[in-house]
Each structure stands twice: as C-alpha cells, then as structure tokens.
Amino acid sequence: VLAEYVEKDKPVAIDKNWPARFLIGLIDKKAGSAFVNGSEIVDRVRMVKDAEEIKLMREASRLNDLAIGRVIELMQEDYDEVEVERKLSEIWEELGADGHSFEPIIGYGANAADPHHSITKGAHKKPGDSIVIDMGCLYKSYCSDMTRTVFYKSVSDEGRKVYEITRDANLKAIDKVKPGVTFAELDAAARDYITDHGYGKYFTHRLGHSIGIDIHEPGDVSAANTEQVVPGRIFSIEPGIYLQIGR
C-alpha cells in the first residue's frame, strides 16, 4: 500500500530500524529512485530536549534515585544477584515507575569488574566485596540511568583508592560541562585524571551516552565526538575502573 503513495522518481527516506521485509517490498515495486537513511534528521531533533521532556526525565531520575537507595539497603540481606533484581522490579512498581529502561546490572565481587556483567543466580556477596549497581527506570516513556558502587561490610585500602579516583574523575567531567565544550573534552577530563593516577588501562569504555526515549541515543560522550554541548542535551557521565582487587 505504501508504494502507491511514493513518487517513483524521488528518493525515499527510511527509518534505520525499519524491518527489512518492508523495505524489500518497496524495492520490488521500484518505489522511489533510491532509499536513504531518514533517521539522522529525526535523531538530531531528538538530541535537544524541550522543557516538558526535561521535566519527565528529572522525574525518571528522581524515582530511580529513590530506588537505588532502597537497593543499597537490600545489601544488608543475603540476597543473590537475581533476587536483588526481582526486588528492584517491585520497588520501581511501588514508586510509580513504568519498569526498567535497560536490563539492570548487579555485580558482586569479581562480577563487579565486568561492565557488561549478566546477573547471576546463586552469586552471593562476601565481606570486602565491591558491588556495582547499574540501573535505570522508565517514566512516561523517558529513561534514567545511574551507576553506584558500594562495599559490603569492609573496604580495602586499594578499593577505597580506586573508588575515590573514579568519583573524582566523575566530578572533574561534570564540572567541565557547559555550552561550547565538546563531548571529547568531557571524556578527556575524566580519562586523563584516571590515567594520571595509573589506572587508565582499566577504563575500558566511553565516558557516557545521550539518554532520552531510548537509553542509548545518538551522541556519545567519547573521544570520537567533537560536537559541542548545547542546552537541552541530556547525557550520562559514568567513568569506571574495572579490576579485581585482592583476587
């Protein structure tokens, strides 16, 4: 049906996520002179949030902040990673969130050294373990994303040192945020600080990413992105040092 409304002598812009089976149908009917990626212009419009979007994302972050506080309280109990995830879903529902914006990461001990760890049934924490909690909720279709590190019962000297370096790197990048600064400069602010303290090789990913209706939207906070920050852009700043301390 769509082919009937397309001018065959003009290019057709296609959404980057459009299923191939639909595109093949248009190609077979020779609808349009060419097919081009139409998502870029939409993505660029979505990069800058308006006042209503910012309000919704503030609420999503507020709910997620409350939830992450309750998850940290759960660490007093002997729940495995899967049980914490189940409790988290209940917490979000109680708070009025609309579910998770991505699959949460709960990593105990050695699992916390993997930035893309999959929650493991039967994984229990023990004294001295670091615990990484990476979670986000949805609120009226808008995403939040937060990462926290806590220690169970005790923390080693190196664990405290790595935590403080990561925290300070985060603050260095946040302090640098203003209109006109590039995303590459934000990445460098955190990465250089971590590198100067001897842990650069353990910071294995970009500094952050844009957030909105999708948890990962176009516009990385990385060394490769030389675009400038402008008012209305919403993005994460999440440096990390990933190593197994004392193991």
Which role fits each region the language model picked out?
Residues V1-R247:
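Active-site neighborhoods and metal-handling regions in enzymes and metal-associated proteins
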